[in-house]
Design a protein with these regions (language model features):
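Bacterial N-terminal signal peptides that target proteins for export
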Residues: 2-12
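Alpha-helical solenoid scaffolds that mediate protein-protein interactions
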Residues: 49, 83, 96-99, 103, ...
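Well-ordered alpha-helical scaffold segments within catalytic/enzyme domains
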Residues: 72-88, 95-98, 138-152, 199-212, ...
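Inward-facing hydrophobic residues that define packing positions of alpha-helical scaffold repeats
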Residues: 93, 143, 156-159, 163, ...
Length: 396
């Protein structure tokens, strides 16, 4: 009798474990909210984000002493234009124009916050008065989109003024061709500083139509050339892992792409360079430029890492060796468009395992706290997936 009871209990335990495992498998196979309703995720995350923008239009980086950057303002403007949120767009634009225009041009100071004396202003002692060409270009594009979205000519006129000064202050003509530099400060040394993630490939055909006096398509050509060389050349390593670097320099005499001249800037693939993947993918989505898909197909390391580990890290040296063991939601989101074009199966896996879980359908917000940068870039990844990043210049 005891033997029969023992066997019965053993069978019951096995059956219970089987049922638990089966339920776990069912749960794993069950689609997540972000997989079923991707458009709702994009809309709800924007509502949650814009609710945290100050009433006067200032975006905050709460993890860095509540600073504001021209980059952060540009992201808010782009997102507001895509989400057809004119009220938020106008608030953010007003604050940006009032507080970040501190020079004799139409470009924007990149860093604003509280100085050592407790005063809130552009942080000049930290180089905050300088411009950043990525933010300036994104703001110009957002203004063009606002003009097309809401049919107010003032937006277009400001965009044209910004484009004129980008060309005057942030672009240099070398051997008869235009090259985009990282900012108005980038020509201070014998070699010029370039950040490849500042190349707005998708925007240049639009800028060419709005500002035909300047050779924006020529800039697109040199930007792809610089990016391809920066990616494939060893730079300061023995070999290249075929990843875009965060920073490089260009020799104005030979046009050779070389390691950055500043010690605090590296050739790693990290929190700057991942944006290249998103920007190039958007160029393909909007313009079907063959250079975009050719470049994405040339990228190494990330696909291999995912196939081996179903993950990849947030920083790789230029030779492709991992520099950390940390993962990043921002970088997964920025890389998602790349995978969606060159390996849809990996894109599907990445979206489910690394992105979809970041959304809490009950809270209609992120499932865990993310910093300002991640909140924006995860949204850009979600929006690319949901096809909520249209070229608004095509609006009639």
């Amino acid at each position: 009798m005891e033997i029969i009871l023992s066997k019965s209990l053993t069978l019951a335990v096995i059956l219970a474990n089987f049922l638990v495992a089966s339920l776990d498998l069912i749960q794993l196979d069950r689609p997540l909210f972000a997989e079923i309703y991707p458009e709702a995720v994009v809309e709800n995350l924007w509502i949650a984000y814009q609710d945290k923008i100050q009433k006067d239009g200032r975006t905050l980086d709460r993890d860095k002493n509540y600073i504001t950057t021209s980059e952060g303002q540009s992201y808010a403007l782009l997102r507001a234009a895509w989400m057809d949120d004119k009220e938020t767009f106008d608030r953010v634009l007003k604050w940006t124009n009032h507080n970040l225009k501190k020079r004799d041009d139409q470009l924007f100071a990149w860093l604003w916050g509280q100085d050592q004396n407790g005063r809130w202003d552009v942080l000049k002692n930290e180089g905050g008065i300088n411009s950043a060409s990525d933010a300036d270009q994104d703001i110009a594009l957002a203004l063009i989109f606002a003009y097309k979205r809401w049919n107010e000519n003032d937006y277009l006129e400001q965009a044209k003024e910004i484009l004129t000064d980008i060309w005057r202050k942030e672009i240099v003509i070398l051997h008869g061709k235009p090259y985009l530099l990282a900012g108005n400060w980038s020509k201070e040394n014998k070699s010029y500083t370039i950040n490849p993630s500042y190349f707005m490939f998708y925007a240049y055909p639009i800028f060419a139509k709005v500002d035909p006096a300047n050779d924006w398509l020529g800039l697109k050509e040199t930007s792809y050339q610089v990016l391809q060389e920066a990616t494939s050349k060893p730079l300061d390593w023995k070999k290249s892992g075929n990843l875009p670097p965060d920073w490089v320099s260009i020799d104005p005499n030979t046009l050779k792409i070389i390691p950055p001249i500043y010690q605090d800037k590296k050739t790693d693939f990290s929190y700057d360079a991942f944006r290249v993947l998103w920007r190039v993918a958007l160029d393909w989505e909007w313009h079907k430029d063959k250079r975009a898909i050719e470049y994405l197909n040339s990228i190494g390391t990330l696909k291999d890492e995912w196939e081996k580990h179903s993950s990849f890290y947030d920083t790789y040296h230029h030779d492709g060796a991992a520099a950390t063991k940390n993962e990043s939601s921002s970088i997964y989101a920025g890389a998602y468009p790349y995978f969606s074009l060159i390996s849809p199966q990996i894109a599907k896996e990445l979206y489910r395992k690394k992105l979809a879980k970041l959304y809490d359908s009950t809270a209609e917000n992120f499932s865990r706290p993310l910093n300002y940068y991640a909140q924006n870039w995860v949204w850009f990844g979600f929006a690319f997936h949901a096809k909520k990043l249209p070229n608004l210049y095509l609006l009639k």
